[in-house]
């Protein structure tokens, strides 16, 4: 397990939990003071953020545990389960916003002290932007699905806070239904983010192959290696931070077993240099046992 991976994803999960808690406290005060349904929407979203981020923090720590006798491939799939759980949390908050927004659209109420709401929303926007910037950096370094899921819903928070600012400004000028309309729009965006997040989590749980550029990098390494005539049955997937890579190398029939093994070891090390921490399995096939239509067909 890459030590940097564990350190970065743990810090990202902890940072998200602390930020969500701080924003919840601020938004409770702002909603109580202004009565804004848009700020209530943001408050509910912060409650969901805390639940999701706490879940993330616990699951990330569990997923970083090394493989054991019962989980020989490690615990990385826990990250995908966390992302799926987050999508459910967020979908629930979106439905709540729809109901609240419709109620206030039918019976709009004047907002109290919109300036306080604007100040609080600006503070929330800046804080969330800083968190998302940090999370994006962690995702770029680790490709953690759990942190990426967390980042997606905090990105939706940034958009939501921007929409709330506009709604508060319009309400200040007497357009009281704007608050409810923006709450409905925010609900649509949150629901979209949740569905996208759930789709990505399910794809990971179903062992979707690595991205095209990563598979192509593996093909390029193998195709250029001396002594390798071709390859087939390339299979890839990812569980947490670990990439699983399997393939068959095609070699000359008269190649000594020791030399064939050495070539396979060299190819494996080259792949590991490109994708550190991967689990690589390589099988060596004499060219004569590989059907002609299959020779050199990496993905078949």
Swiss-Prot record:
It is found in: Cell inner membrane. GO terms for molecular function: cadmium ion transmembrane transporter activity; ferrous iron transmembrane transporter activity; metal ion binding; zinc efflux antiporter activity. GO terms for cellular component: plasma membrane. Pfam families: Cation_efflux, ZT_dimer. Homodimer. It comes from Cronobacter sakazakii (strain ATCC BAA-894) (Enterobacter sakazakii). The chain crosses the membrane at residues 12-32, 39-59, 82-102, 114-134, 156-176, 182-202. This is Cation-efflux pump FieF. Zn(2+) binds at residues 45, 49, 153, 157. Belongs to the cation diffusion facilitator (CDF) transporter (TC 2.A.4) family. FieF subfamily. It catalyses: Zn(2+)(in) + H(+)(out) = Zn(2+)(out) + H(+)(in); Cd(2+)(in) + H(+)(out) = Cd(2+)(out) + H(+)(in); Fe(2+)(in) + H(+)(out) = Fe(2+)(out) + H(+)(in). Keywords: Cell inner membrane, Cell membrane, Ion transport, Iron, Iron transport, Membrane, Metal-binding, Transmembrane, Transmembrane helix, Transport, Zinc, Zinc transport. Divalent metal cation transporter which exports Zn(2+), Cd(2+) and possibly Fe(2+). May be involved in zinc and iron detoxification by efflux. It comes from the Bacteria. It is a multi-pass membrane protein. One of its GO terms (biological process) is intracellular zinc ion homeostasis.
């Amino acid at each position: 397990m890459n030590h940097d991976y564990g350190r970065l994803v743990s810090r990202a999960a902890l940072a998200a939990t602390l930020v969500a808690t701080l924003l919840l406290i601020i938004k409770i005060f702002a909603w109580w003071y202004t009565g804004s349904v848009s700020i209530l929407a943001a408050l509910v979203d912060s409650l969901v953020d805390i639940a999701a981020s706490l879940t993330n923090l616990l699951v990330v720590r569990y997923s970083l545990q090394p493989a054991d006798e019962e989980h020989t491939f490690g615990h990385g799939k826990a990250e995908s389960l966390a992302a799926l759980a987050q999508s459910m949390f967020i979908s629930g908050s979106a439905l709540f916003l729809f109901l609240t927004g419709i109620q206030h659209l039918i019976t709009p109420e004047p907002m109290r002290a919109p300036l306080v709401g604007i100040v609080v929303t600006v503070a929330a926007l800046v804080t969330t932007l800083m968190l998302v910037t940090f999370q994006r950096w962690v995702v770029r370094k680790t490709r953690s699905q759990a942190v990426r899921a967390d980042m997606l819903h905090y990105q939706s928070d940034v958009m939501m806070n921007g929409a709330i600012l506009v709604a508060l400004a319009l309400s200040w000028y007497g357009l009281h239904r704007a608050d409810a309309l923006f709450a409905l729009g925010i609900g649509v965006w949150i629901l979209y983010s949740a569905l996208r997040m759930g789709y990505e989590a399910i794809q990971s749980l179903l062992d979707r192959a690595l991205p095209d550029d990563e598979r192509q990098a593996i093909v390029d390494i193998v195709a250029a290696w001396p002594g390798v005539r071709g390859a087939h049955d390339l299979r890839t997937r990812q569980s947490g931070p670990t990439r699983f890579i399997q393939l068959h190398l095609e070699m000359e029939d008269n190649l000594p077993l020791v030399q064939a093994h050495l070539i396979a070891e060299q190819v494996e090390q080259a792949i590991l240099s490109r994708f550190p921490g991967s689990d690589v399995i390589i099988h060596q096939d004499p060219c004569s046992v590989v059907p002609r239509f299959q020779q050199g067909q990496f993905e078949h």
